[in-house]
């Protein structure tokens, strides 16, 4: 992951006064951490959530029926996560991400190894993405970095239209 690219994205958000928030599951707060690596990020990043458990997602406001109907590992859940954090923190952009970082999740039957779902929400417009890769031989940290790279790559493309 190129830190200069992320820095450039965050500086663009700062310059345009465009706020951003995150709700992360499989990346465990890495996206938020990378956002705040840029000096001045507090001007556009009020915070985010790390919601590793389904119960935590529901606690912060994700509708439990989304998880029950579509599963926690789904584009619908990623979008619900983004909408929830956007509503709670009143940001222009919100990111929701859910998926697995290794073995299948015994607590969620819908888990597929190496598949991540994320949503970039700008105002009310949702863009959902599914990314699948072979994660065998990768550490959990490497997988999280790969997923974060995908999010920032799509965010960079989205900013062209903002």
Predicted stretch roles:
Residues 1-160:
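Short alpha-helical segments enriched in small residues
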């Amino acid at each position: 992951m190129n830190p200069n690219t992320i820095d450039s994205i965050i500086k663009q958000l700062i310059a345009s006064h465009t706020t951003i928030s995150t709700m992360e599951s499989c990346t465990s707060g890495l996206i938020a951490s990378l956002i705040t690596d840029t000096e001045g990020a507090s001007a556009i990043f009020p915070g985010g959530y790390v919601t590793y458990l389904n119960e935590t997602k529901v606690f912060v406001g994700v509708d439990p029926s989304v998880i029950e109907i579509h599963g926690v590992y789904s584009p619908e859940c990623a979008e619900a996560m983004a909408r929830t954090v956007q509503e709670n923190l009143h940001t222009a952009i919100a990111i929701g991400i859910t998926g697995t970082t290794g073995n299948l999740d015994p607590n969620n039957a819908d888990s597929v190894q190496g598949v991540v779902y994320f949503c970039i929400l700008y105002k009310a417009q949702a863009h959902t993405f599914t990314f699948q890769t072979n994660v065998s031989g990768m550490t959990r940290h490497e997988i999280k970095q790969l997923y974060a790279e995908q999010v920032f790559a799509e965010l960079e493309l989205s900013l062209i239209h903002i």
